[in-house]
Amino acid sequence: MKALTTRQQEVYDLVRDHLAQTGMPPTRAEIAQRLGFRSPNAAEEHLKALARKGVIEIVSGASRGIRLLMEEEDGLPLIGRVAAGEPLLAQQHIEGHYKVDPSMFKPSADFLLRVNGMSMRDIGILDGDLLAVHKTQDVRNGQVVVARIDDEVTVKRLKKQGNIVQLLPENSEFQPIVVDLREQSFTIEGLAVGVIRNGDWI
């Protein structure tokens, strides 16, 4: 399958989501309206491009004649090693998909992150575990978060006071990471909501 352009991906996502929500694909006019195209003909051109790339099939003679061919992966994306400067959920970081029900976690998990190291050992997060993560930036002091400092991704307990963030380990052999928000790039990628070890939720 050939890679999709950003616009083609938007059209594909719209068709997929419309199917999931209503049970039928959108019309060309609906696609044009939702994505700001000037006419349904522009939507038709994008659909033809998607058909050429093998991700949809256009069924002639029907205003909603669109069939998805590209199978969506089941389960939660598993994030492995993250390259510097790239989004955590970039396609190249996804090692695979893990068949687990996101709703078994509260709040529900959006992705899994492979744990690297033993800095959170004392609360049962071990090297090689799969950490279930709810994607959000709405977190509170004391919660275990997935954070990005400059280009490093880490799992720690959050303590924020003014412009200073401390990321606290749960292992006395490790030192806290101190971040000055005035000098360093800092992003919360999500909230830890559970751990999977050897295929079992614990």
From Swiss-Prot:
Coiled coil: none annotated. Keywords: Autocatalytic cleavage, DNA damage, DNA repair, DNA replication, DNA-binding, Hydrolase, Repressor, SOS response, Transcription, Transcription regulation. GO terms for molecular function: DNA binding; serine-type endopeptidase activity. Residues 28-48 bind DNA. InterPro entries: LexA, LexA-like, LexA/Signal_pep-like_sf, LexA_DNA-bd_dom, LexA_repressor, Peptidase_S24_LexA, Peptidase_S24_S26A/B/C, WH-like_DNA-bd_sf. The active site is at residues 119, 156. It holds the Pfam family LexA_DNA_bind. It catalyses: Hydrolysis of Ala-|-Gly bond in repressor LexA. One of its GO terms (biological process) is SOS response. The record marks 84-85 as: Cleavage. It comes from the Bacteria. Its EC number is 3.4.21.88. NCBIfam families: lexA. Homodimer. Belongs to the peptidase S24 family. Represses a number of genes involved in the response to DNA damage (SOS response), including recA and lexA. Binds to the 16 bp palindromic sequence 5'-CTGTATATATATACAG-3'. In the presence of single-stranded DNA, RecA interacts with LexA causing an autocatalytic cleavage which disrupts the DNA-binding part of LexA, leading to derepression of the SOS regulon and eventually DNA repair. This is LexA repressor. The gene is lexA.
